[in-house]
């Protein structure tokens, strides 16, 4: 009976990863995080801000209208009699109003700034896409770690039951007079150690669940363990992932920022050119004076030009800003390429780790079963049994973490290559 109980415990440990009802799919957390994660919300607000700034720049080179009005109470009114009738120069109660339409005719610097602002807004759109991919990476990391911690809790619980069964076996051997009290003490100490392992596993599970909830805005359902499996297939060649480097949202956003900085530098040079604007004003007043008309209009063409030391210094400043943007673009491009390479190599290493960990898990579980059977008949010491059980537990923990790291590495590779996890990936569950 005791041997059968131990075998059942080992079977539960070995086959915990078989398909079963589980917590919500990764897509649920990813979709929510893309809209509710603070980083995604910040990037989305940044896009709205840049679009508004683009409209501000455009508005400065488009026709505009302004109006003003005033009421004046004069202490003394002034009236002049010109023979044909009195002319009010300064009334006691004076009302004035005017409206002016301004039309920029030539503003090369303003037009260039409009183009730069539009480029910056476009870059912000790609920055939002990049931020969402980064959010997905965080969610995937938390999700698969949660599954690993969930599995570790199950394994720790199984190990505790196995340890308790070993304690009962030691107590029976002591009662039969074939084992010393030392074996019971060792078995009891092992039970307490496994209890501590289970408490630590529960803590990690709770922390992982909270981290996933904070990143995604969705509370994970922890009622049933989730499956974690990978078929150990190799990924396509590294070149297939690096081929889309220039289309990655982060790279496109950095390139757009560089182009916008260059356009701003060009706009600063255009500021050396004069600007020309036309105005048309309509004025109404209760004090027309000698004109004799309450309403008058005025049309004008205005010419503006200025030059001083700040003009040259501003050009140099904008040129330096463009150089900074180019350096940042290069850094982003290199970092993106390195991230793809790192994740691709991580997947390759994780496949080897997972394959080895699975084989080690099976061997360690078999060794633990043999040690249990041999300890029952007294052919090995209790220390041998405890060591075999600890080795089996360590092997199972290593297998769980290796599988979780592998599945996560595949997800991180696709994200590094600019592919959202909302697109299903073959071979990964």
Q: How would you name each of these model-derived features?
A:
Residues 132-247, 343-346, 350, 392, ...:
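Periplasmic alpha-helical coiled-coil/stalk elements that build and connect Gram-negative outer-membrane
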Residues 1-8:
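Bacterial N-terminal signal peptides that target proteins for export
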Residues 174-178, 375-379, 416:
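A short glycine-centered flexible hinge/capping loop motif at secondary-structure junctions
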Residues 17-20:
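N-terminal signal peptide c-region/cleavage motif recognized by signal peptidases
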Residues 75, 398-429:
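Acidic, low-complexity, intrinsically disordered peripheral segments
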Residues 41-45, 58-62, 105-132, 182, ...:
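Sec/SRP-type N-terminal targeting helices
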Residues 28-105, 127, 137, 214, ...:
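A small-residue-enriched
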